[in-house]
Curated annotation (Swiss-Prot):
Residues that bind ATP: G11, I12, D13, G14, A15, G16, K17, S18
Protein name according to UniProt: Thymidylate kinase
Organism this protein belongs to: Nitrosomonas eutropha (strain DSM 101675 / C91 / Nm57)
Key words, A-Z: ATP-binding, Kinase, Nucleotide biosynthesis, Nucleotide-binding, Transferase
Family according to the record: Belongs to the thymidylate kinase family.
Gene Ontology BP, a term: dUDP biosynthetic process
Keyword match Nucleotide-binding: yes
Catalytic activity from the UniProt record: dTMP + ATP = dTDP + ADP
Length: 215
């Protein structure tokens, strides 16, 4: 049995990840693949409890506490969902993964990258996504989308400056890991974003096929 592939979607709140993630899942299922859709934090019983705690706007917490809870949820996510699915040949698509910690806890909260790297190695033991699609949108557009969509959570209540730091951290990660992270302009129309994402996914798909991966 061939190991499956792990794809992550990243972006600040309001970037449109969820909409495009659903499309990609359908695209891959149409090709006969088993596809597991997950999210962070969450996707396990404990992870969903931690998600509620982390997003609760009534619950203030230290940046390091937030970081440790994120990585605790991630360890459960890996152990209970991601790794078992990949081992049986399924493809896993996650709404956020570790790049989000470097962006939100690192860029946004100011947690040093060195500490995040230690946690990343401890929790993931060298594991990383096969492909990451980062949907980049200006903070002004992000805020407009979030405010019109739902009641704000603890992160969404942060000021614009916080999200600008998060966005810049994401862009820096995209430069640092350009082979894995593909940037899509999320400020374009839905159709234009979809077209750009399809191009990214199809290139990845073709690369897997040419390397001998049996679809």
């Amino acid at each position: 049995m061939q190991r499956g592939k792990f794809i992550t979607f990243e972006g600040i709140d309001g970037a449109g990840k969820s909409t495009h993630l659903a499309w990609l899942a359908s695209f891959l299922r149409d090709k006969g693949l088993e596809v597991i859709v997950t999210r962070e934090p969450g996707s396990t019983a404990l992870g969903e409890q931690l998600r509620q705690l982390l997003l609760d706007h009534r619950q203030a917490m230290h940046a390091e506490t937030e970081t440790l809870l994120m990585f605790a949820a991630r360890r459960e996510h890996l152990d209970k969902v991601i790794l078992p699915a990949l081992e049986r040949g399924a493809w896993v698509i996650s709404d956020r993964f570790t790049d989000a910690s470097f962006a939100y806890q690192g860029g946004g909260r100011g947690v040093p990258s060195a500490r995040l790297e230690i946690l990343e190695q401890w929790v993931q033991k060298g594991f990383s996504p096969d492909l990451t699609v980062y949907f980049d949108v200006p903070v002004t557009i992000s805020r407009q989308r979030v405010q019109s969509a739902r009641t704000a959570d603890r992160f969404e209540l942060e000021p614009d400056l916080f999200f600008e730091r998060v966005r810049q951290a994401y862009l820096q990660r995209a430069k640092q890991f350009s082979e894995r992270i593909r940037v899509v302009d999320g400020s374009l129309s839905l159709e234009e974003v979809r077209t750009a994402m399809v191009e990214v996914v199809e290139k990845f798909w073709s690369a897997q096929a040419s390397s001998g991966y049996r679809m």
